Amino acid sequence: MSVAAGDKPTNSRQEILEGARRCFAEHGYEGATVRRLEEATGKSRGAIFHHFGDKENLFLALAREDAARMAEVVSENGLVEVMRGMLEDPERYDWMSVRLEISKQLRTDPVFRAKWIDHQSVLDEAVRVRLSRNVDKGQMRTDVPIEVLHTFLETVLDGFISRLATGASTEGLSEVLDLVEGTVRKRD
């Protein structure tokens, strides 16, 4: 088998994921029909479902990929810096709209919610490790448990993503992030 032929399934899978991300972001989970997924990916329904089985598994694959990517960025830079990056260059964070769809599915689909917990745990662990590391360095406040700081940052992130994805004004958001950072940092 040639190298090019060997690469084709991986490329096809990645092309499907990229097209599906655009489709879910534009039309939402419910609006991302098979026809729209075919158009967005440039692949047949047979190719799409060969790789992912069904629409839910395709969506979960996107969610898993996005959670892993975000966990990597969080572990290096912290969640507030991720939000600063989103504010400065929202196009780089194409997963924002998909994350909104994930939130909607979590509210309405208990089966999806059960499957999502494993994917979210990757991101949660990255945030906890980062917070713990910063506590050990003496940079974080210690009068509240790490879990409370984590929940606070996650809540801010969800609102931040919602605001950016819906096109609401970003005026003052940089100062809001300064406030968030000051809130979780050690007080002198």
Curated annotation (Swiss-Prot):
Mg(2+) binds at residue 181. One of its GO terms (molecular function) is transcription cis-regulatory region binding. Residues 33-52 bind DNA. The keyword DNA-binding applies. Changing residue 99 to A: Weaker binding to DNA. Disruption phenotype: Deletion of acnR leads to a 5-fold increase of the aconitase activity. Overexpression of acnR leads to a 2-fold decrease of the aconitase activity. Changing residue 66 to A: No effect on DNA binding. Signal peptide: none annotated. GO terms for biological process: regulation of DNA-templated transcription. Residues 10-70 form the HTH tetR-type domain. Citrate binds at residues 79-80, 130, 134, 185. Keywords: DNA-binding, Magnesium, Metal-binding, Repressor, Transcription, Transcription regulation. Changing residue 55 to A: DNA binding affinity is almost completely abolished. Still forms a dimer but the ratio of aggregated to dimeric protein is significantly higher. The keyword Phosphoprotein does not apply. Changing residue 104 to A: DNA binding affinity is slightly reduced. Still forms a dimer but the ratio of aggregated to dimeric protein is significantly higher. InterPro entries: Homeodomain-like_sf, HTH-type_TetR-like_transc_reg, HTH_TetR, Tet_transcr_reg_TetR-rel_C_sf. Homodimer. AcnR negatively controls the expression of the aconitase gene acn. Binds to the imperfect inverted repeat in the acn promoter region. This is HTH-type transcriptional repressor AcnR. It comes from Corynebacterium glutamicum (strain ATCC 13032 / DSM 20300 / JCM 1318 / BCRC 11384 / CCUG 27702 / LMG 3730 / NBRC 12168 / NCIMB 10025 / NRRL B-2784 / 534).
